Amino acid sequence: MTNVVVIGSQWGDEGKGKIVDWLSERADVIVRFQGGHNAGHTLVVDGVSYKLALLPSGLVRGKLSVIGNGVVVDPHHFVAEVEKLRAQGIAVTPDVLRIAENAPLILSLHRDLDALREDAASNSGTKIGTTRRGIGPAYEDKVGRRAIRVIDLSEPETLPAKIDRLLTHHNALRRGMGLSEISFNALHEELTSVAEHILPYMDQVWRLLDEQRKAGARILFEGAQGALLDNDHGTYPFVTSSNTVAGQAAAGSGLGPTALGYVLGITKAYTTRVGEGPFPCELHDEIGKHLSTVGREVGVNTGRPRRCGWFDAVLVRQTVKTSGITGIALTKLDVLDGLDELKICIGYRLDGKEIDYLPSSQAAQARVEPIYITLEGWKESTVGARKWADLPAQAIKYVRQVEELIGAPVAMLSTSPEREDTILVTDPFEG
């Protein structure tokens, strides 16, 4: 038995929700370790759909769910998401949900700054494509050592000084942007009004997880977004504001790296991306439209359409290395049904030279051209397949080619949005 880290191996939206739900039924503890409420996913349990963005997926199954210190927590969204789950009959109490006392808070001033910057960048043609939910500015305050954290809400005697320090920074920014300043009283009221809703869930998460590990609990670390959006290893600056690679599961939860275990990379059978940034295999033709339409490629949280393209083995192979992926869960294979031929990117051409990696340079990333191999497609349906024998021969060939090119085996194969439509090759908890 081992613990499991689940991450997206591409730019997010790989289908983590279904796989995490499948695994969470077998887990004892589910942990969020990075990001905020900027990446949503939908779980379908007994025919009921649950849309989550901040809360761990294990809540819908009554499992102990933990929001780690690596997550930035919007208290207003937290309350709204909890209330929505309760309205759907899910019990959300401190018995099943814990929040790290050292998790930073996202406040209204962070959302304001995020939106203002994105608007300014849009006007200058340099926008990143953020969700405008304050994630980036909240992480900036964390790194700048001025963030207000969950535990600060429990110490009213020291909170005023922390508010002053935060406002000194933000009001200087607002003055420079021609905006009115935020008053001490307004921010103090915002914080005190949410304290009673957050503090009952506060805990020393690092200690809790260590105790659970020693007791033999199966711990599932639930990553958000994708490794190619990692602040260090992604397509910088078109990335998120946190680390999304598997190593962050340790830093963002307080449980040491030796406890992480199996790393499962959720990998879509083609490639999608939301927002701005390089996308070497992007398709603007009828195939791209097919992938978008059949794959229903629209963001759960934002409603933004996703850009679509062929499978990029170069990128996933790189993620396998940077995240130490043990095996992948290949999703949305059924979206490829009916295509006459399929292409897989096996390398890039940069200024006339062939390379087998994505360069770090933003300019070089924009210039790379994909090198493809072409495989025969299949006409049969793979929808609902639950064993290898149900798959067309060409579909199996496609899967084997992906394994060979990325240097990692397929541990799970998803053939529809339904959780039961999954071919299990290797149980990550037993891996």
UniProtKB/Swiss-Prot annotation:
Binding residues annotated for IMP, in chain numbering: D13, E14, G15, K16, N38, A39, G40, H41, T131, R145, Q225, T240, R304
Domain of life according to the entry: Bacteria
Lineage of source species: Bacteria, Pseudomonadati, Pseudomonadota, Alphaproteobacteria, Hyphomicrobiales
UniProt function note: Plays an important role in the de novo pathway of purine nucleotide biosynthesis. Catalyzes the first committed step in the biosynthesis of AMP from IMP.
GO cellular component: cytoplasm
EC number annotated for this UniProt entry: 6.3.4.4
Required cofactor(s): Mg(2+)
Residue numbers binding GTP: 12-18, 40-42, 306, 332-334, 414-416
Entries under SMART domains matching the protein: Adenylsucc_synt (SM00788)
Enzyme class: ligase
Catalytic activity as recorded in UniProt: IMP + L-aspartate + GTP = N(6)-(1,2-dicarboxyethyl)-AMP + GDP + phosphate + 2 H(+)
Keywords: Cytoplasm, GTP-binding, Ligase, Magnesium, Metal-binding, Nucleotide-binding, Purine biosynthesis
Residues engaged in binding substrate: V300, N301, T302, G303, R304, P305, R306
The keyword Nucleotide-binding appears for this protein: yes
Stated name of the protein: Adenylosuccinate synthetase
Entry-linked InterPro entries: Adenylosuccin_syn_GTP-bd, Adenylosuccin_syn_Lys_AS, Adenylosuccinate_synth_dom1, Adenylosuccinate_synth_dom2, Adenylosuccinate_synth_dom3, Adenylosuccinate_synthetase, P-loop_NTPase
Gene encoding the protein: purA
Active site: D13, H41
Alphabetical GO biological process terms: 'de novo' AMP biosynthetic process; IMP metabolic process
